[in-house]
């Protein structure tokens, strides 16, 4: 029975992590990535052909198709730490697309 409780908590943790898509990053992640990789599409909010950077507020608006926006994907590697009845999740975040853009 204890195994199933552990499995249930583990799956609940995985489900909550998968709830954050690249299009809707956590604010902390968004600030980190958009400081270094301004070309990622998830850093911008666009309406009626004009796009505004979500993090760099002093950056002027750009036309949607005139700025080289790329579809980047964030990949998370997580480990689960059991400390008694409490589970902790530690994740490292990486993106190969963003690395390519940084080196470009």
Swiss-Prot record:
Q: Mind telling me which InterPro entries this protein's record contains?
A: ASFV_fam_110 (IPR004848)
What biological function has been recorded for the protein in this entry?
Answer: Plays a role in virus cell tropism, and may be required for efficient virus replication in macrophages.
- Keyword presence, Signal: yes
What's the protein called, per UniProt? Protein MGF 110-2L
- Give the record's keywords alphabetically: Early protein, Signal
Note the Pfam families from the entry: v110
The similarity comment for this entry is: Belongs to the asfivirus MGF 110 family.
Q: Which gene encodes it?
A: MGF 110-2L
- What is the annotated signal peptide range for this record? 1-31
